[in-house]
């Protein structure tokens, strides 16, 4: 069996790891360190570590791989292939050179578009109608190696980061399973990326999460679904942050300053943008409160909202 080092961290990576465990010999798993989670800051292992522990696989968790003791230990292993999927760190050249068959990455975009750490978020924020999975050889430069295989998938109007993450996670494992035989046998024909067509999806920053109501409704809608269910787009109402998990676009002929609540229905809070498409907030969370449907919030506040300004 092919001896593989797997490197990954979040839920996206777990389906790939499960497939590799079933089909090959995973001799080591490298993931990020445990992190404090929640209000009580409970130290929590990353999803990939939980899978590795279930199968009693050796786990390495360097804070930074370059120059680490864990790297020195990995370099002593007899390995055929390194597979990464959303690991979260660049690999040192010494590690890239270690496996006999090279190092490959499962990336959640149609490269060269959306290189970087947040390709699913950015594709939805940009209003793309499709994205996909790329299996590529790894090089020193971020997400720039030769493409081995790709498969596209449609982004539906009602998709958000959560739904696309789940679809792409399954697609990534399936495409890798199809692609691995040609990599192992040395029969694949990889294709260089066209760097002139490269775009980048940097990790989401806090300032990327705030909604600018002065944009067209479609852009606001795409931002909301491109950040849901994490890290979540937000606005401010009455000096209180308001997270928006779900919304829809509605046509309006009411002319109002962008960010103004122009109407409420039984199920939504309708907010003006800078064009004739308003945003209907359906699922929300006020700071310090539990997440709730707008319908539940409106049962006690419907008559007091129209005319308020979100900023």
Swiss-Prot record:
InterPro entries: Fmt, Formyl_trans_C, Formyl_trans_C_sf, Formyl_transf_N, Formyl_transf_N_sf, Formyl_transferase-like_C_sf, GART_AS, Met-tRNA-FMT_C. Its EC number is 2.1.2.9. One of its GO terms (molecular function) is methionyl-tRNA formyltransferase activity. CDD domains: FMT_core_Met-tRNA-FMT_N, Met_tRNA_FMT_C. It comes from the Bacteria. It holds the Pfam family Formyl_trans_C. SUPFAM superfamilies: FMT C-terminal domain-like (SSF50486), Formyltransferase (SSF53328). (6S)-5,6,7,8-tetrahydrofolate binds at residues 109-112. Keywords: Protein biosynthesis, Transferase. It catalyses: L-methionyl-tRNA(fMet) + (6R)-10-formyltetrahydrofolate = N-formyl-L-methionyl-tRNA(fMet) + (6S)-5,6,7,8-tetrahydrofolate + H(+). It is an enzyme of class 2 (transferase). GO terms for cellular component: cytosol. Attaches a formyl group to the free amino group of methionyl-tRNA(fMet). The formyl group appears to play a dual role in the initiator identity of N-formylmethionyl-tRNA by promoting its recognition by IF2 and preventing the misappropriation of this tRNA by the elongation apparatus. Belongs to the Fmt family. PANTHER family: METHIONYL-TRNA FORMYLTRANSFERASE, METHIONYL-TRNA FORMYLTRANSFERASE, MITOCHONDRIAL. This is Methionyl-tRNA formyltransferase. It comes from Staphylococcus aureus (strain MSSA476).
């Amino acid at each position: 069996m092919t001896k593989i080092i797997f490197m990954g961290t979040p839920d996206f990576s777990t389906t790939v790891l499960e497939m590799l465990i079933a089909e090959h010999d995973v001799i080591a798993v490298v993931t990020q360190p445990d992190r404090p989670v929640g209000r009580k800051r409970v130290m929590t292992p990353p999803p990939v570590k939980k899978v590795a522990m279930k199968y009693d696989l050796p786990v390495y968790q360097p804070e930074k791989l370059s120059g680490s003791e864990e790297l020195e230990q990995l370099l002593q292993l007899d390995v055929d292939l390194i597979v990464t999927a959303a690991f979260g760190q660049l690999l040192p050249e010494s590690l890239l050179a270690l496996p006999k068959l090279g190092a490959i990455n499962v990336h959640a975009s149609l490269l060269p578009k959306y290189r970087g750490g947040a390709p699913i978020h950015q594709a939805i924020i940009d209003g793309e109608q499709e994205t996909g999975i790329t299996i590529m050889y790894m090089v020193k430069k971020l997400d720039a190696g030769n493409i081995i295989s790709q498969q596209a998938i449609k982004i539906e109007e009602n998709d958000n980061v959560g739904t696309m993450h789940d679809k792409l996670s399954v697609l990534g494992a399936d495409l890798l399973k199809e692609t691995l035989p040609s990599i192992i046998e040395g029969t694949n024909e990889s294709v260089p990326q066209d760097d002139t067509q490269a775009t980048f999806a940097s990790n989401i920053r806090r300032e990327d999460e705030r909604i600018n109501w002065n944009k067209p409704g479609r852009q606001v809608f795409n931002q909301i679904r491109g950040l849901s269910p994490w890290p979540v787009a937000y606005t401010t109402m009455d000096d209180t942050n308001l997270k928006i998990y779900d919304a829809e676009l509605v046509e309006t002929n009411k002319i109002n300053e962008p960010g103004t609540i122009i109407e409420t229905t039984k199920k939504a809070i309708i907010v003006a943008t800078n064009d004739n498409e308003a945003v209907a907030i359906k699922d929300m969370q006020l700071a310090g409160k539990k997440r709730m449907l707008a319908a539940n919030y409106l049962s006690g506040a419907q008559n007091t909202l129209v005319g308020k300004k979100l900023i």
